[in-house]
Amino acid sequence: MASRGGGRGCGRGQLTFNVEAVGIGKGDALPPPTLQPSPLFPPLEFRPVPLPSGEEGEYVLALKQELRGAMRQLPYFIRPAVPKRDVERYSDKYQMSGPIDNAIDWNPDWRRLPRELKIRVRKLQKERTTIILPKRPPKTTEDKEETIQKLETLEKKEEEVTSEEDEEKEEEEEKEEEEEEEYDEEEHEEETDYIMSYFDNGEDFGGDSDDNMDEAIY
């Protein structure tokens, strides 16, 4: 049977490394490990590129600055939150940090943009104003006397009206009593006529039967 190695040349490949290329001669000991950080990279000199001179460069620079300013004034520009103060002041709520929709002069062609991006003008809510009514002057003695006179005249008028109503009621009651008396007299006369014409005391009863007394009476 053949051995597992299959001979001397069938093993792993031998690695050859030239130590002299690193700066170490034959028989020299290896240098000790360095425990210090590696030296820093030398600083680079950042020199600005010379600006292009001419009308084209100035136009591009002005256009770029205008675009940046317009982007910062849009409501979609995210700004860092303002830190809240420990002590709130009365004027803080009236100082608006963000831009107002009415102050944005941006009128693009909205037919080419979606409706969601269209700016909607917000209406500021008006604060409720309290109406201060003028104070009425205090009533003087003359005003009091006038009111008392008016009340007295009203009382007199009411008394006159009530007295007239009472008189009318009394007249109506008297008329009703007179009508009732007349009605009673007429009824009394009718009753007496009926008594005089139809009353029979029974004296004439049996006058014709005296001639036939012989008959038996049961």
From Swiss-Prot:
GO terms for cellular component: nucleus; RNA polymerase III complex. Residues 139-160 have a biased composition (Basic and acidic residues). Keywords: Nucleus. It is found in: Nucleus. The keyword Acyltransferase does not apply. Pfam families: RNA_pol_3_Rpc31 (PF11705). InterPro entries: RNA_pol_III_Rpc31. It comes from the Eukaryota. Coiled coil: none annotated. Its main location: nucleus. Residues 161-193, 201-218 have a biased composition (Acidic residues). One of its GO terms (biological process) is transcription by RNA polymerase III. Residues 130-218 are annotated as: Disordered. Component of the RNA polymerase III (Pol III) complex consisting of 17 subunits. Pol III exists as two alternative complexes defined by the mutually exclusive incorporation of subunit POLR3G/RPC7alpha or POLR3GL/RPC7beta. Found in a trimeric complex with POLR3C/RPC3 and POLR3F/RPC6. Directly interacts with POLR3C. PANTHER family: DNA-DIRECTED RNA POLYMERASE III, DNA-DIRECTED RNA POLYMERASE III SUBUNIT RPC7-LIKE. DNA-dependent RNA polymerase catalyzes the transcription of DNA into RNA using the four ribonucleoside triphosphates as substrates. Specific peripheric component of RNA polymerase III which synthesizes small RNAs, such as 5S rRNA and tRNAs. Belongs to the eukaryotic RPC7 RNA polymerase subunit family. This is DNA-directed RNA polymerase III subunit RPC7-like.
